[in-house]
Amino acid sequence: MIEQLDLFPDLVNKKNDTVEIQLSTEEKIKQAVRFIRSLGAMHNIALAFSSGKDSTVLFYIAKEAGIRFTPVHNVTTIDPPFTIRFAEKHGCIIKRPELSFLDLVEKRGFPTQFHRFCCNQLKKKYIADYLLLGIRKDESVKRTKCYSEMDDVYYFSKKIFTNRFFPLLNFNNNDVENCIKEHDLECHPLYYDAEGNFHVERRLGCIGCPLQGDRGKRDFQQHPILLKQVLRRGILYHKRLGRTENDAVLNLVYNLFYSNSNYKNYCQTFQGLFNVNPWTILQKHFQITQNEVLQYLPKPKF
């Protein structure tokens, strides 16, 4: 295993063994380049390229490091527009899943923040023995807690038997924005507004992801056809279990609007304690009617 702290000497306070981030963006880039170069003797190195701003910066740094690596993009089938095209521009190998997201909904139901089986099925697959990822602690409070130690720059995944490395772990949003602007990096089109201004605070992700909260709802407002397709496949799942169309819609509406409250409330949805007509909520927020959804139910695949 690599001695992580020796690769990042400027980040460590030797007196009390605490990690203090006091580097400029360019110094952090140099440290990341040095770290990636230390992996150069290893074989079968890949870079997970999501087409987001972080993987764009990581791709640039890996190129600067001069090592051989293979950029790989996992298609989720509910990616934002232009995502696959942007990955192809970076020479990525495009990996498509055996089952689409809609297939997974029909097979396993709607994903929730408590049960995100779609991530494991569509994203967390074996790619290579050594994998570079653009994960940053700064992205969320949860990740800050999860990757609190410098040793977390390296992690071995037993699920997919892959050594995972996070060269951008201590980059913050300012570092990412500075790197993109200083080195004139082209980012995914959705990071730019109509005037061409770059917005580092924007995030790419699967359309309608339950972890995105209000943004997930806005995604479906912008993509109502996808929401109808998700509903139809979810209805097939619930009907296979002996439930009704209303049960399926109730489940999805709760996942979109209420499941962030607490797990107890989530469990109560199947005990008749949810007193709002879910079709009414769909009509109000997405202008989707019951007839539009039920009229075009596909044939079951499972």
Question: Can you say where each PLM-predicted feature lies in the sequence?
Answer:
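ATP-dependent adenylation/nucleotidyltransferase module used to activate substrates
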Residues: 1-182
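ATP/NTP-dependent adenylation/nucleotidyl-transfer catalytic domains that generate, transfer
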Residues: 2-6, 12, 192-302
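Glycine-rich nucleotide phosphate-binding loop and flanking beta-alpha elements
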Residues: 138-139, 187, 215
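Extended serine/threonine-enriched, polar tracts that run as long, contiguous segments within proteins
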Residues: 182-189
